[in-house]
Amino acid sequence: MSLLINIDVPDAEIGERFYTAAFGLTVGRRFGKGFVELLGWESPVYLLAKNAGTVGAGGDLRRYERHWTPFHLDVVVGDVDAAVARAVAAGATLEAAAKDTPYGRIAMLADPFGHGFCLLQFSAKGYDALLGA
């Protein structure tokens, strides 16, 4: 199996500018207007232009204001503070400043379309730090 990351956005050009500036991703292929592949992570990212108010799934309408969802991306970085500065400069909203945890340093943000994500810098032990003695 493999993983693809599809992100609905109301404007693919704005999405492309954000994701390339915030994360250093590069454009792979363009599949017509409003559908672009971004490369640079272990899995490709596909930005799909979908208008707000259109049906997403199960009758739920797409909305691009900030919303909570139990599913989000954690982007693992080498320097969380530098990554936060880069993402915010590109248009992200910082929702929770970077904090230290047993497994590393983590900050919570949202992209310009309301999709939440975390920036995570693992400690030497990473999630193994959460295992019992």
Please place each PLM-identified region on the residue numbering.
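Residues forming the ATP-binding cleft of Hanks-type serine/threonine protein kinase domains
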Residues: 77
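Conserved active-site tyrosine of GNAT-family acetyltransferases
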Residues: 15-20, 87, 114
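Conserved beta-strand-loop-alpha-helix junction that forms the acyl-donor binding cleft
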Residues: 9-11
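Short glycine-/small-residue motifs
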Residues: 116-119
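Vicinal oxygen chelate
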Residues: 1-4, 25-74, 84-110, 121-133
